[in-house]
Amino acid sequence: VLAGTVVLTACGGGDKAETTAAATTAAAAETTAEETTAAETAAEETTEAEEKTEGTAELRIGQVEAAAHGDKCFAIVTAVIDNNDTIVASYIDEYQFLSTNETGIPNSESFAESGAVAADKVLASKRVNDAYYSEMMKKAGSTKNIAENFNEIQNYADGKTITELEELSGKTPEEVVDAVSSATLVDTQGYVAAIVDAAKAAQENDAVVYEGDVDSLSLKRIEAAAHGDKCFTVAAALTDGTNVVLSYLDEYQFLTTNEVGVPNSESFAESGAVAEGKVLASKRANDAYYSEMMKKAGSTKNIAENFDGIQSFVNGKAIEELEAFSGKTPEEVVDAVSSATLADTQGYIAAIVEAAKQ
């Protein structure tokens, strides 16, 4: 039994799916509270309309990189919103250069061998290295692990509108920590702001219509080596436990300083963690540059367009159905996913599946 139904739509960023047309705004609902016959009738009609659309939501996903906490790390934040700009789900992780005793992101060894990263350093996910990083936090007086803090901030943001979260930007960091009482990070305000930015990015992306209980959906994310050893992939999946409802792909590679690096790239170079002349860069953020290199190799689609094509293929499919692609050849998978032309399409699908199964 499927937990819900995903209906793929052609609506772009900012458009509204037809299935949501019966929904009314909170402002409209408030105006029906007047004690007149006409207002009471309108209130009844509003209730009926809401009942008709109950369990149906238009969902979009977006992702950003941010400098939410100082200059020694950067965050990657993902957010899913509905047609009312409410955060349905969010996900925070942060990446910092640590010693090689800790667990680095995929292809860390290759990054060191190429000279892009210092030999004694690895770029590491704070969630993956939760125990190590949280021990350092404990010495500084923290009472909660870093992963637990990230989860608490996510829980606070989920269910709130973009506008509601933006109101925190006018408060002091201390006031925000007090407001998000379940989290103890002094830079809580920065993480909430990053969720807002990810949600705004989602507004520009295409939507799917989900017919089911959105409260049952979970947003999960992993790092993977989906394409060779010169980069690493971040794959996100919104799932109801059976299907991939929405997905998001981006990939990060060390490029020259002529390109757009992740936040705090200058600090990473100054510390010696990253080689001079190099920046870690999002392929989506550097779509034009990276796609020009692909074009020289014979590609007919930009990298972002390819990622979007894979996402569109995956969205709405059962996890079990997607797992079957692991038994096919890379060429067969490329043929099946006609919306993408990447030779490693199979690897990207596998990364989304792995995220969904977390």
Question: Which functions belong to the PLM regions below?
Answer:
Residues 3-4, 50, 242, 276:
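Low-complexity, intrinsically disordered short peptide segments enriched in small/polar/basic residues
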Residues 11-21:
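Bacterial lipoprotein signal-peptidase II cleavage site
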Residues 1-3, 13:
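Sec-dependent N-terminal signal peptides
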Residues 19-51:
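Extracellular mucin-like PTS domains
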Residues 55-61, 65-219, 226-358:
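Active-site- and interface-proximal helix/loop "cap" or "latch" segments in soluble metabolic
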